[in-house]
UniProtKB/Swiss-Prot annotation:
Reaction(s) this enzyme catalyzes, per UniProt: diphosphate + H2O = 2 phosphate + H(+)
An example Gene Ontology CC term for this record: cytoplasm
PANTHER family linked to this entry: INORGANIC PYROPHOSPHATASE
EC number from the UniProt entry: 3.6.1.1
Protein name (database record): Inorganic pyrophosphatase
Parts forming coiled coils: none
Cofactor(s) listed: Mg(2+)
Heme recorded as keyword: no
Gene: IPP1
The species this protein was found in: Komagataella pastoris (Yeast)
Length: 285
């Protein structure tokens, strides 16, 4: 199963879209890519939205047909994550698990907050990647960010092909082989919105990163929530459910690919120099 990307327009522009292709045909990274690459070995597929050390706030579009990756906007302007010293941009390869959904109608019994209406967020702690890459990963743990009153899980994973992958099998292995990384992850998620005038984010479980078993339970809950969504048992709101592979679902539409423009890649547009500024946050390490 081979995945590739179809880029429309230049990165860092409002027009830019990155579609995912499987064997040359456009698929939805939200609905068509299987959650598991190999369920018996607990190997999952992850869609990379933001490569580490970059600033553009890229995400799978829930509302557009076939859910391309695009840059988030606010009041018509492209959004970028600020650099919070000593970090630069996103500190991990950041993305999402396909075929998962954090249901905004359900309050989690332990976080006491509803889901954030997005696919499940993933932090891949290995080496550099690219937007639209479909990585095969193994789960190590999960943090529960409380983002503006919503439960926003952050699943910690490692690419199975990463040199460190054989040594990392649960969350305690991360501290052993990558000391300081979980503390830095907690700090970054806590402070990264402060330069934009927002308050510090909070965590459930006092910021503790839960282990692999707990993370797997969260993933299963979000998988079941997505299944209800895609089969029409939960109202989708503005979420586009169009897919090209799930024949038994109401929104199965293989012909939808014909409306996707042909690839038109271009060199990235220049980013304003202000995005390179470092912000020094009081109370951060």
């Amino acid at each position: 199963m081979s995945y590739s990307t179809r880029q429309i327009g230049a990165a860092n522009t409002l027009e830019n879209r990155v579609f995912i292709e499987k064997d040359g045909q456009v698929v939805s990274p939200f609905h068509d890519i299987p959650l598991y690459a190999d369920e018996s070995k607990k190997v999952l597929n992850m869609v990379v939205e933001v490569p580490r050390w970059t600033n553009a706030k890229l995400e799978i579009s829930k509302e557009e047909k076939l859910n391309p990756i695009l840059q988030d906007t606010k009041k018509g302007k492209l959004r970028f994550v600020r650099n919070c010293f000593p970090h630069h941009g996103y500190i991990h390869n950041y993305g999402a698990f396909p075929q998962t959904w954090e249901d905004p109608n359900v309050t989690h019994p332990e976080t006491k907050a509803k889901g954030d209406n997005d696919p499940l967020d993933v932090c891949e702690i290995g080496e550099r990647s690219y937007t639209g890459q479909v990585k095969q990963v193994k789960v190590l743990g999960v943090m529960a960010l409380l983002d503006e009153g919503e439960t926003d899980w952050k699943v910690i994973v490692i690419d199975i092909n990463d040199p460190l992958a054989p040594k990392l099998n649960d969350i305690e292995d991360v501290e052993k082989h990558m000391p300081g990384l979980l503390r830095a992850t907690n700090e970054w998620f806590r402070i990264y919105k402060i330069p934009d005038g927002k308050p510090e984010n909070q965590f459930a479980f006092s910021g503790e990163c839960k282990n692999k078993k707990y993370a797997e339970e969260v993933i299963q809950e979000c998988r079941e929530a997505w299944e209800k969504l895609i089969f029409g048992k939960t109202s989708p709101g503005e979420i586009d459910l169009t897919n090209t592979t799930l024949q038994s679902t109401p929104s199965f539409s293989p012909s939808a690919t014909s409306a996707v423009p042909t690839a038109s890649p271009a060199a990235p547009a220049k980013i304003d120099q202000s995005i390179d500024k470092w912000f020094y946050i009081s109370g951060s390490a």
